[in-house]
């Protein structure tokens, strides 16, 4: 079993008025050379939580942190015009909270952060995307 001490929340950086399925996400990651989706979990706009990668395997979502983290991504993050925005639906907010609380229970002492907290240099154009923190979930 891997040592986990970090839960990293991402957005898919897709427009909130468009559908971006777990299949779309996986296909995009395969095109980028990954072996599959880089995130362990994906939360759709309707709140469905999709398991994309076994927790026993490191993710491909936060360079330098993958070996000790779990990647959670929610669908959206951009408004209808493509501008960064907190587009989480009430369903996504609920599912994200439940999932994170379960993960924190399974991996006590883990820290919760947004992807922007680990690689702000890579997210300059999306710096204002709201990736939830522990305080906004609990």
Which residues does each PLM region occupy?
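Acidic carboxylate-rich catalytic motifs and surrounding loops in phosphoryl-/glycosyl-chemistry enzymes
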Residues: 110-120
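Residue-level detector of flexible, active-site-proximal loop/helix-junction positions
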Residues: 56, 119, 136
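Short catalytic/ligand-binding loop motif for oxyanion handling, primarily in non-cytosolic enzymes
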Residues: 16, 120-123
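Active-site-adjacent loop/helix surface patches within enzyme catalytic domains
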Residues: 2-111
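Single conserved hydrophobic/aromatic residue that forms the stacking wall/gate
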Residues: 127-138
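Short aromatic-enriched loop/helix-cap "lid" or pocket-rim segments at secondary-structure transitions
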Residues: 55, 124-127
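Histidine-centered divalent metal-coordination motifs
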Residues: 10-11, 115, 128
């Amino acid at each position: 079993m891997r040592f986990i001490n970090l839960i990293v929340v991402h957005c898919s950086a897709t427009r909130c008025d468009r559908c971006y399925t777990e299949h779309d996400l996986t296909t995009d990651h395969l095109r980028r050379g990954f072996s599959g989706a880089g995130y362990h979990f994906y939360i759709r706009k309707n709140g469905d939580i999709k398991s994309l990668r076994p927790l026993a395997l490191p993710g491909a979502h936060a360079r330098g942190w993958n070996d000790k983290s779990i990647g959670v991504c929610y669908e959206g993050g951009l408004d209808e015009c493509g501008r960064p925005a907190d587009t989480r639906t009430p369903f996504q907010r609920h599912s994200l909270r439940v999932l994170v609380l379960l993960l924190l229970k399974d991996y006590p002492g883990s820290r919760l952060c947004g992807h922007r907290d680990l690689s702000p240099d890579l997210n300059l154009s999306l710096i204002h995307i709201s990736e939830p923190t522990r305080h906004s979930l609990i």
